[in-house]
Amino acid sequence: MVKIGVLGLQGAVREHVRSIEACGAEAVVIKKVEQLTQIDGLIIPGGESTTMRRLMDKYGFIEPLKQFAREGKPMFGTCAGLIILAKKIVGYDEPHLGLMDITVERNSFGRQRESFEASLAIKGVADDFIGVFIRAPHIVSVGADVDVLATYEDRIVAARQGQFLGCSFHPELTDDHRMTQYFINMVKETKE
């Protein structure tokens, strides 16, 4: 059985655990760097990206997470997690992990649209996935080898680059586990 970690520093941790378990995989909440060796793939959840970054610095996660990526292990960033994975963030000089060749903009759907749901067609996942957007970022641009998986109102809201998967919305907040299953399948492929 594959083991999927959820970075447990801040954000929607419990909901991701529930979704992973609903897909028949084992979930591990990651609170210590040493735990990264126990898992096959990692979800970086939604929350608040600057707070998450502060905690990642405090607990020494930045370099170990980059090493985890260098080992070829899949990583899935949702909402704030997407921002953590991105190589460029609009209005910021430095990225967080800078692993995925995308540029993201924070809170890009505007204050008046703080949260909403939208039906999405996600390539390889579903034609009718309900995305829950909460102060969501979006992907402004992608590198040449990044596959755009979904758009909403002409904005990129899900993408994949090899072992990296990212989305603007919160797939863990509904009972539709197909996006989580897609990531688990990515992890299984790397183990084969």
Swiss-Prot record:
GO CC, any one term: glutaminase complex
Q: Which GO terms describe its biological process?
A: glutamine catabolic process; pyridoxal phosphate biosynthetic process; pyridoxine metabolic process
- InterPro entries, alphabetized: Class_I_gatase-like, PdxT/SNO, PdxT/SNO_CS
| Substrates-to-products reaction catalysed | aldehydo-D-ribose 5-phosphate + D-glyceraldehyde 3-phosphate + L-glutamine = pyridoxal 5'-phosphate + L-glutamate + phosphate + 3 H2O + H(+); L-glutamine + H2O = L-glutamate + NH4(+)
One Pfam family, short name: SNO
Q: In which pathway does it act?
A: Cofactor biosynthesis; pyridoxal 5'-phosphate biosynthesis
**Enzyme Commission code:** 4.3.3.6, 3.5.1.2
- Hydrolase recorded as keyword: yes
Q: Where does L-glutamine bind?
A: G47, E48, S49, R106, I134, R135
The subunit structure is: In the presence of PdxS, forms a dodecamer of heterodimers. Only shows activity in the heterodimer.
Q: Which HAMAP family match?
A: PdxT
Query: What is this protein for, i.e. what is its function?
Result: Catalyzes the hydrolysis of glutamine to glutamate and ammonia as part of the biosynthesis of pyridoxal 5'-phosphate. The resulting ammonia molecule is channeled to the active site of PdxS.
State what protein this is by name: Pyridoxal 5'-phosphate synthase subunit PdxT
Traced from the root, the source organism's taxonomic lineage reads: Bacteria, Bacillati, Bacillota, Bacilli, Bacillales
